[in-house]
Design a protein with these regions (language model features):
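Short, polar/flexible loop-turn hinges at active-site or ligand-entry regions and domain interfaces
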Residues: 91-97, 145-147, 165, 218-223
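Conserved catalytic core of two-metal-ion nucleotidyltransferases
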Residues: 46-49, 53, 59, 97-150
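Helix-loop-helix transmembrane hairpins and adjacent membrane-interface loops
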Residues: 93, 101-102, 121, 149-157, ...
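N-terminal regions immediately upstream of nucleotidyltransferase
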Residues: 14-64, 187
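Low-acidity, Ser/Thr- and Arg-rich intrinsically disordered low-complexity segments
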Residues: 2-13
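Conserved nucleotidyltransferase catalytic core and NTase-mimicking acidic/glycine-rich helix/loop elements
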Residues: 23-27, 162-249
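Active-site nucleotide-donor binding segment shared across nucleotidyl transfer reactions
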Residues: 49-98
Length: 249
């Protein structure tokens, strides 16, 4: 089941977990100009990884039957200063993890990090991924953080197999989505503030290239270096926009 994304949606009567939960200090990284682009995103993702593992341990999580995984931009190691933190708590069937979820989510909410989260079994995740493109691509980015690694591996492996099995459907839907996205974002050459994420040639297009390759239909022919350089430039611009404005941009 999906969980609410703000504390106001959750019951105030629930125990928020250990009184001295580990804290995430991002400011030193934000103040260090030597970190930019891909290097910044990888370093921030690594620091958040370590923080979430400490939270998992502080929550007295079991060693089997439950796992915490990163998905989306966080799963890809693309965290910018204003990025949402997308994490799923994956659990075995007939395992009640509601109390564990509260002990993990509340310290994250308390840190003022924007949290996108869900609690599901592997089967539930795959059922959603079989019928929803956003969930299907999220599963492609699953990265294990803490807990039962076999659950994370099962989700990643079966998610990729499902993606390839339904590749024709997903690629056709992706094509329609890309065209709509480009139209909504406008012509880049005429925009004072082009959309670095959703515009033509933006980060979403880089992701689409990767997803097509995972489906067995690569879109590139020996031009990986140029794409990598463009990806670095896009992430560098996005990181600096987040740094200077203090918000997602």
């Amino acid at each position: 089941a999906n969980w609410a994304t703000t504390r106001s949606d959750a019951s105030r009567s629930i125990d928020s977990g250990p009184p001295m939960a580990p804290e995430l200090d991002r400011q030193p990284l934000l103040d260090d100009p030597s970190f930019r682009g891909v290097a910044f995103c990888r370093e921030l993702s690594a620091r958040v990884d370590a923080w979430l593992r400490r939270l998992w341990e502080a929550a007295d999580a079991p060693t089997s039957g439950a796992a915490l995984v990163a998905v989306g931009g966080y799963g890809r190691g693309e965290l910018s200063p204003g990025s949402d933190l997308d994490v799923w708590l994956i659990h075995a069937p007939r395992t009640d993890v509601s109390a564990l979820a509260d002990r993990v989510w509340y310290p994250i909410w308390d840190s003022d990090v924007k949290l996108g989260h869900a609690v599901r079994t592997v089967k539930e995740s795959l059922a959603l991924a079989s019928d929803d493109l956003d969930t299907a691509t999220a599963v492609l980015s699953v990265r294990h953080l803490a807990g039962d690694e076999s659950l994370s591996a099962e989700l990643a492996e079966k998610g990729l197999a499902l993606w390839r099995k339904r590749s024709r459907r997903w690629l056709e839907e992706m094509d329609r989505g890309i065209r709509d996205r480009h139209e909504k974002a406008g012509e880049v050459a005429f925009l004072l503030e082009p959309d670095l994420k959703n515009g033509r040639g933006g980060l979403r297009d880089v992701h689409a290239i990767d997803w097509a390759a995972l489906a067995g239909m690569p879109l590139l022919a020996g031009d990986d270096v140029a794409v990598a350089e463009a990806y670095e430039l896009l992430l560098s611009a996005r990181v600096e926009l987040h740094r200077r404005t203090g918000r997602a941009a």
